Structure formats: C-alpha cells, structure tokens
C-alpha cells in the first residue's frame, strides 16, 4: 500500500469515529440544540454553506509568538450551529511545556461567524463577518471572504479594549482545510511598529463531525 493509500485509509477510519460524536447538550431546552455534527440536529442554514467545512470540533497543536519568545500550545476549536444564520465559535488553548505536556491556560475566544446580508449589494453579501470576544479583555470584528471552497481569509475591521484588557493591534487570519482533512490557520497581528508579524499558527485534527 502506498503512502497515499495509507493516508486515505487512515482518514476514512478517523471519519468513522468522528462521525459518531457530537457536543453535549441539555435536552430539556425548548429550542433547537447546538450541534457540531452535520449528520445530527437542525439543518445548516443555506446562507452558511460556504462555511460548512468548518463545522465540527477540532483539536491539535500550534506555535505562538509573544514578547518573551516563541511557545507551543494545544488548542480545541468548537464550531457549531442551531439552524440559525450564524455559526457558534469557541476556541480555547493551553501552553505546553518542553515535553509537550499541559503547562497553564492560554488564549480563549468566543463568537459568531455570519455572512453580510445586503440585497442591494450582491457582492457585499459574499462578505464574512466574524465577531469575537477574547478572554484577554478585548472585542474584535473581522471581515473577509472565502478564497475557495475550503479556505477563508479575514482582517480586523474594528477592535475595542476594556480598561483591564490586553493592548493588541489588528490581525489577519487565514483558515483552510488541508491534506488529510485537517484545519490549519495562521494569524498575523500588527506590532508596535505598525506592521503585520506572525503571531499564531496551528494544525488541528477533526475530533467531532
């Protein structure tokens, strides 16, 4: 069996496992439950079909750059929906030590992916909105577009910081589904000199969906 065949077989086996998983929910609420598995729950809103590959739970590791130097982190991203015209987004990460073990909590963000709805401007209606609240004390609004069926690019349009929040610059993010069905991304942020510099990157494997 060639390496390519082995990769396909491994992906198929992984899909059989992840397809049976979903995020936990409380079953007594009188509204559609969140689901991170497109095989279960409400149908995905047609307005979100260009974001369909993102739905799921993703886990993996990445690299970050901070003032004290580079570091490695683990991360889980949950992308779910309830049939509405938005995707729920929750990302949390943790620092890893030199042995690849948990060291301490890291960055955390939560928010929503939406498409701009402007019947008067069909081109603008293809724009993505990503609204994020960060545990470090700031709120961020991204706008972007799908680059193709499996990659998306977004850039910060507005940023608001609380009095206790971290001082940060705007960012540019690129997400994509890559070889093996993994989710990869890179984030650049504006530094003190006003230029975009590498900040975060990660490769995550599907865990649910």
From Swiss-Prot:
Catalytic activity from the UniProt record: peroxynitrite = nitrate
GO molecular function: heme binding; metal ion binding; peroxynitrite isomerase activity
Secretion signal span: none
Cofactor(s) of this protein: heme b
InterPro entries: Calycin, Nb(III)_bact/plant, Nitrobindin, THAP4-like_heme-bd
Known EC number: 5.99.-.-
The keyword Metal-binding belongs to this UniProt entry's keyword annotation: yes
Sequence motif GXWXGXG, location on chain: 56-62
Keywords, ordered alphabetically: Heme, Iron, Isomerase, Metal-binding
Family to which this protein belongs: Belongs to the nitrobindin family.
Protein name as it appears in the record: Peroxynitrite isomerase 2
């Amino acid at each position: 069996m060639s390496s390519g065949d082995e990769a396909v077989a491994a992906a198929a086996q992984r899909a059989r496992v992840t397809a049976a998983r979903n995020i936990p929910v409380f079953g007594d609420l009188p509204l559609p439950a969140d689901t991170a598995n497109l095989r279960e729950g409400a149908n995905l809103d047609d307005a979100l079909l260009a974001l369909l590959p993102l739905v799921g739970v993703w886990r993996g590791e990445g690299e970050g750059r901070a003032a004290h130097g580079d570091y490695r982190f683990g991360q889980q991203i949950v992308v779910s929906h309830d049939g509405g015209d938005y995707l729920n987004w929750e990302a949390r990460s943790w620092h890893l030590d030199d042995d690849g073990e948990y060291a301490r909590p890291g960055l955390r963000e939560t928010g929503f992916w939406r498409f701009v709805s402007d019947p008067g401007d069909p081109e603008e209606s293809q724009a993505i909105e990503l609204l994020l609240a960060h545990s470090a004390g700031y709120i961020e609004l991204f706008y972007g577009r799908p680059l193709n069926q499996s990659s998306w690019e977004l850039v910060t349009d507005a940023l608001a910081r609380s009095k206790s929040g971290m001082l940060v610059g705007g960012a540019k993010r690129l997400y994509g589904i890559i070889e093996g069905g993994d989710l990869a991304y890179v984030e650049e942020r504006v530094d003190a000199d006003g230029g975009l510099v590498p900040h975060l990157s990660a490769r995550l494997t599907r865990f649910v969906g």
